């Protein structure tokens, strides 16, 4: 299976001037953990994740005053839609991140999350029994 088989092609995008609260609200509404940040004046897209927002709030920053552009994930890795899901998962583990922006010919075409990979590998309706958590 390839990245194109698991990626989400309808991507939540925000601008660098959006507040962290606006980005978080959009992520909650769309039930996603990341938004691609598109800045017409920058060379490529960025990503802001729920983790980036939590870190900012945890550091005492005001989510209504802080902008997305100041809290982008560092060291962004882009994936090709032709990568295998194994390659994508390995890149995520090596880079210690949970989302890959998928580009083709320099154009944003999707985003792939760890959840997307697990969904493909287990099937949309994984039917195996989930063991109960141990008490204690």
Language-model regions, residue ranges each:
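Short hydrophobic/aromatic-rich motifs at helix boundaries and adjacent loops
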Residues: 6, 22-26, 39-41, 59-62
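Tandem CBS (Bateman) regulatory domains
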Residues: 1-10, 49-78, 84-93, 108-109, ...
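A glycine-centered beta-loop-beta connector
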Residues: 27-30, 35-51, 92, 100-115
């Amino acid at each position: 299976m390839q990245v194109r088989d698991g990626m989400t092609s309808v991507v939540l995008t925000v601008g660098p001037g959006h507040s962290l609260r606006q980005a978080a609200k959009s992520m909650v509404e769309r039930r996603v953990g990341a938004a691609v940040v598109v800045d017409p004046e920058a060379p490529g897209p960025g990503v802001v994740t729920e983790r980036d927002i939590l870190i900012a709030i945890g550091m005492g920053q005001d989510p209504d005053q802080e902008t997305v552009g100041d809290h982008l994930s560092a060291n962004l890795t882009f994936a090709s839609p032709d990568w295998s899901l194994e390659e994508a998962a390995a890149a995520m583990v090596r880079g210690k991140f949970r989302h890959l922006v998928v580009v083709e010919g320099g154009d944003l075409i999707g985003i792939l999350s760890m959840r997307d990979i697990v969904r493909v590998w287990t099937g949309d309706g994984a039917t195996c029994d989930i063991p109960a958590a141990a008490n204690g």
